[in-house]
Amino acid sequence: MTLLNASTQPRVGSGFRLQWEPVQNCHVLLYPEGMVKLNQSGGEIMARCDGQRSVAGIAGELEQEFSAQGLGPDVLAFVEMAGKQRWLAWD
């Protein structure tokens, strides 16, 4: 993976599948050995990681949708953590 920055376009990592789980009332990340239950913030970020949107674009969408400002550093930190867990990948 290349270095992470605001223009990085993350996508769900190979071997993982993101889906909404009505029973859990949250997004979950499924993989062969189990499941990761995401909190609302993590689910909202992961749902936008389609390999087309940049980290900055994702932060902008979330700021608009939730009437918030300054989410860029938090989104970047989540993407970095998710990349270390291999939940997300980028070129």
What are these regions (language model features)?
Residues 1-47, 91:
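Acidic, low-complexity/disordered tracts enriched in E/D and polar residues
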Residues 34-91:
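Long, charge-rich, low-complexity alpha-helical segments
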